[in-house]
Amino acid sequence: DFDIDLTSVIKNIESEENVEEDEVTVSKSSSLYKNSSDASTIVYPNETYGKVGFSSIFTKSGTRYKLINKDVLTSDLQKYSSKLYTLLQMVNKYNSGNVFIYSNYVSYGGTTLIKQLLLANGFYEYSSKNPHEYKSFVVFDESTNIKNREQYKRIFNSDENKTGKLIRIIIGSPITSEGITFKAVRQVHILEPYWNMSKINQIIGRAVR
C-alpha cells in the first residue's frame, strides 16, 4: 500500500528552501507557500506534487489535458487526496444545488486540477449545444475570456438555474473574489484557505448575500 507522510513532505520542502526555524511569516508568493499548498491538496503516486506530480498523470496536447492514470482521481482518490475526496463527496451529496469552488491558483494544483477532477467523475464542461442537466460546470479564471465570463455569470444567476440545472458548479480563481455575485449558491468550498479571515469572508461573500 502507498502511505503518504504529509508532514515529512512539507519538512523536505522547508529543508530544500533553507527556511530558518525562527521565520515567523512566509510570503504567499514564495515557492515554499506554493509547494506546501500543492502538497496539502494532493500527493501523487510517485510522492510528487504540484507541476511535477500533475504531469505524471496527465499528458498535454495544445491546451487540452488527457488523464493517463484515471484511478488517482477516481477509485484511489481518497488515498492521494483527502481534501479532493471530501470535496467530491460534498458535491455529490445532493443531486442539485449550485456550488462555488474557489482556488487561489490556476495551473496544476488549482482550477485546472479541479476541472480535471470533475471531468473524471461524471461532470461535464458547460455547453449550450450539449447540455447535461445538474452535471455541468464552468471555469471562471484568468484563462476564461471576458465574453464567456459574462455569459456564464448570467446563466448561473438566471431564474432557470436556481437549482443548478444549466450550470451547477462554478470553479473560480482570485478574479472572482471581488465585484462578482453568484446567486442561489448552496455550497462554497475554498481549496486553500487564507490566514486572513477577512479574505475568506470576501470569497464567501461572492455567493452569500
PLM feature spans:
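Helicase motor interdomain insertion/brace
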Residues: 1-184
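Short conserved active-site loop signatures built around small residues
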Residues: 188
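Conserved AAA+ ATPase "SRH/arginine-finger" region at the nucleotide-binding site
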Residues: 191-193
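Conserved SF2 helicase motif VI
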Residues: 196-209
